């Protein structure tokens, strides 16, 4: 896909319908990934309506994060009932999945539906709660792992589509996920498709070129069901760019934590008891607050950024600090091998693009970015984590980087 925008001879709604129609006609199995948000909701509306006209069946995947608004759960159930005639299988997944908890250094990861703890709410009776339902499922696997494995499992070794409602203008990472020149396409004239791991499924992005104004214009014109939580967010003064519906404790998502306190006080109380750091996150994680180093980061005047990073590491719980030391050591060694010394700061070093500096490392630590995504890391598989940790700890001694906690 070109990094330059090339105008199409049709509008975005016509283009989206054309892409969905092609998907339904070309691939025998189609699954819509649905979060309960405005984008995936619009995609589900379009896909289900076209499937109904064409006499086709679709499947839907919904990951239930346990700590979610009642509005969202009710909305998901409403769409499930609205399109029951075209939905062959609705995978309402309520299994333990691991994701970041960017609110606490004592519990930097959390599992939804974790066994033997008191949950924020109970899953629906027909939700998938049996770990043996999916042959690929491993207890505590990450959301990213689950979705990759699900795509291959769903294909049944035949061509299949996983429809994903992300938009390229939402973030740099989402733009790259679609536009990267390294992605394999179904065909050269299908730049809105990418190959899923496993070789049988294809990720389809039918609304990749929509803007947020286009989304709301469509809902206004068509009067289709939308998550009522957005109305509550609007009334609470939340800017459009911060209206997110997903798991609530990630680096970006935590900015909306305070809404639980306002909209659902009972659920808020359960979340505070369930997940470490939620109460402080509700106070300090707002989009205008610098507590977590979200936008602007400051350091003590008598320290440089490298010294500040070491101070932050030494102030953390030891287990969490060792995790970060291992990641940072790999990061520094990678540049060391290229003959590049990571500077204290450089222009653009705390933006979306990974421009190396000690200030960027400080931002990762302040942001509680446990998986170090801002340093271009992906989550380590939980079953390999302990062995990986010990191996990198030994490598640090060999490299002479961040050994002896200095």
Curated annotation (Swiss-Prot):
Q: Which GO terms describe its biological process?
A: cellular response to oxygen levels
Which top-level group of life is the source organism from?
Bacteria
Which cysteines does the record link by disulfide bonds?
none
Which InterPro entries does the UniProt entry name for this protein? DUF3440, PAPS_reduct_dom, Rossmann-like_a/b/a_fold
Checking Pfam families in the record gives: DUF3440 (PF11922), PAPS_reduct (PF01507)
One GO MF term attached to the UniProt entry: catalytic activity
Q: Any idea what this protein is called?
A: Uncharacterized protein YbdN
Task: Please give the organism.
Answer: Escherichia coli (strain K12)
Highest lineage ranks of the organism? Bacteria, Pseudomonadati, Pseudomonadota, Gammaproteobacteria, Enterobacterales
The protein's gene is named ybdN
């Amino acid at each position: 896909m070109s990094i330059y925008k090339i105008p199409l001879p049709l509008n975005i709604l016509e283009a989206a319908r054309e892409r969905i129609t092609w998907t339904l006609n070309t691939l025998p199995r189609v699954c819509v990934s649905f979060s309960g948000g405005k984008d995936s909701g619009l995609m589900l509306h379009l896909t289900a309506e076209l499937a109904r006209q064409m006499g086709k069946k679709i499947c839907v995947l919904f990951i239930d994060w346990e700590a979610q608004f009642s509005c969202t759960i009710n909305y998901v159930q409403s769409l499930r009932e609205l399109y029951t005639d075209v939905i062959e299988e609705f995978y309402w997944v309520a299994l333990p999945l691991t994701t970041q908890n960017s609110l606490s250094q004592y519990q930097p990861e959390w599992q939804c539906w974790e066994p033997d703890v008191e949950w924020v709410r109970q899953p629906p009776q027909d939700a998938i709660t049996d770990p043996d339902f999916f042959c690929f499922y491993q207890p505590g696997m990450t959301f990213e792992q689950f979705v990759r494995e699900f795509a291959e499992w769903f294909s049944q070794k035949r061509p299949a589509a996983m429809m994903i409602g992300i938009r390229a203008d939402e973030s740099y990472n989402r733009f790259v996920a679609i536009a990267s020149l390294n992605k394999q396409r179904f065909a050269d004239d299908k730049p809105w498709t990418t190959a899923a791991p496993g070789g049988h499924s294809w990720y389809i992005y039918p609304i990749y070129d929509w803007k947020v104004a286009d989304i709301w214009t469509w809902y206004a014109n068509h009067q289709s069901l939308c998550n009522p939580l957005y109305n509550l967010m609007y009334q609470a003064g939340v800017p459009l760019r911060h209206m997110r519906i997903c798991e609530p404790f990630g680096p970006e998502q935590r900015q909306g934590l305070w809404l639980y306190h306002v909209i659902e006080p009972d659920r808020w109380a359960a979340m505070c008891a369930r997940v470490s750091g939620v109460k402080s996150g509700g106070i300090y994680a707002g989009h205008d607050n610098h507590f977590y180093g979200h936008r602007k980061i400051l350091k003590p005047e008598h320290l440089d950024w490298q010294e500040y990073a070491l101070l932050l590491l030494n102030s953390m719980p030891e287990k969490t600090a060792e995790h970060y030391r291992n990641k940072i050591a790999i990061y520094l060694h990678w540049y060391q091998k290229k003959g590049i010394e990571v500077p204290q700061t450089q222009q653009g070093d705390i933006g979306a693009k990974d421009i190396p500096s000690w200030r960027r490392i400080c931002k990762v630590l302040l942001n509680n970015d446990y998986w170090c995504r801002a340093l271009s890391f992906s989550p380590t598989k939980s079953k390999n984590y302990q062995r990986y940790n010990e191996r990198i700890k030994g490598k640090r001694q060999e490299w002479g980087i961040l050994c002896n906690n200095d």
